[in-house]
């Protein structure tokens, strides 16, 4: 996976994902997701990262797994939909796919209701971006196809 832009850049650009998890109340999620993608944090972000994880430094490489204890209405679905949109729409996967193969971003959830919520959030991320909106090929009840 080769990012076309960093997650930080995407989350800062209103033409990409800048409106997805904007505002002060989403700062913790932005910090965790940026760190999870292996990007370096600023000092103010590192303080938040340390407070949330107990770690002094971010990993500086993309992580394979992310686990967090987050209560109800803690923003999990919207945050995961945002990073899923980033991975599906703003990263190049030619290094992992053979010509003609289509990538699939699988979102596993507690049940179909929660999976649909995440899919709806991801679709909204694509739709709100004039750039990402162009990537939508098809939407069905349980899938969002992008090209």
Where do the model's predicted regions map?
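Phosphate/NTP-binding elements of NTP-utilizing enzymes
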Residues: 1-147
């Amino acid at each position: 996976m080769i990012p076309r832009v960093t997650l930080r850049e995407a989350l800062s650009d209103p033409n990409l994902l800048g409106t997805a998890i904007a505002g002060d109340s989403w700062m913790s999620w932005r910090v965790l997701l940026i760190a999870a993608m292996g990007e370096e944090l600023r000092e103010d972000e590192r303080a938040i990262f340390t407070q949330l994880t107990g770690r002094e430094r971010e990993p500086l490489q993309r992580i394979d797994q992310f686990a967090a204890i987050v209560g109800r209405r803690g923003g999990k679905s919207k945050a995961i939909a945002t990073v899923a949109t980033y991975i599906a729409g703003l990263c190049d996967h030619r290094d992992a796919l053979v010509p003609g193969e289509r990538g699939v971003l699988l979102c596993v959830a507690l049940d179909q209701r929660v999976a649909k919520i995440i899919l709806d959030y991801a679709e909204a991320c694509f739709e709100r971006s004039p750039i990402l909106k162009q990537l939508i090929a098809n939407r069905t009840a349980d899938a969002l196809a992008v090209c």
